[in-house]
Amino acid sequence: MNNLLLHFFCVAVGGAIGASARFAMVLAMQSFGVRAFPFATLTVNIIGSFFLGLLLAYAEQQPVSETTRLFLGVGLLGAFTTFSTFSVEVVALASQGELLKAALHIAFNVIICIAAVFAAMMLYSTTVK
């Protein structure tokens, strides 16, 4: 298998797993009656950001193959997190007059996801050294 085909395969398989995991998270949260605020999107974005932060921190210390980076970072975590769904949810909340919820959704996703990346990188650097 040539490298380009292998790279597409890694992204596709990782993406299928990530998208399926995101769908499972949404279903799980809906089964608990969580619908008033888009917590499922927030949750997957925080978790995905955290694990992407771990991957980045690990890659700074240890060699990570291109196929692993593509499978985990681009495929699995790229499909698990969801900026497009986040954007649609913000517009839907705003269109329904839920401006505070829309603003909170933006703030929580941006601030908490960036904090999750930072926390993961700090956690990795303090536990590995």
UniProtKB/Swiss-Prot annotation:
User: Annotated Gene Ontology MF terms?
Assistant: fluoride channel activity; metal ion binding
- Protein location: Cell inner membrane
Q: Which residues bind Na(+)?
A: G78, T81
Any one of the GO CC terms: plasma membrane
What keywords appear on the UniProt entry? Cell inner membrane, Cell membrane, Ion channel, Ion transport, Membrane, Metal-binding, Sodium, Transmembrane, Transmembrane helix, Transport
Q: Which Pfam families match?
A: CRCB (PF02537)
Q: Which InterPro entries match?
A: FluC
| Species the sequence originates in | Idiomarina loihiensis (strain ATCC BAA-735 / DSM 15497 / L2-TR)
Query: How is activity regulated here?
Result: Na(+) is not transported, but it plays an essential structural role and its presence is essential for fluoride channel function.
Please give the start and end residues of each transmembrane region.
8-28, 36-56, 71-91, 103-123
State the family it belongs to.
Answer: Belongs to the fluoride channel Fluc/FEX (TC 1.A.43) family.
Membrane association type: Multi-pass membrane protein
The protein's name: Fluoride-specific ion channel FluC
Listed under catalytic activity are:
fluoride(in) = fluoride(out)
Q: What does this protein do?
A: Fluoride-specific ion channel. Important for reducing fluoride concentration in the cell, thus reducing its toxicity.
- Principal subcellular localization: membrane
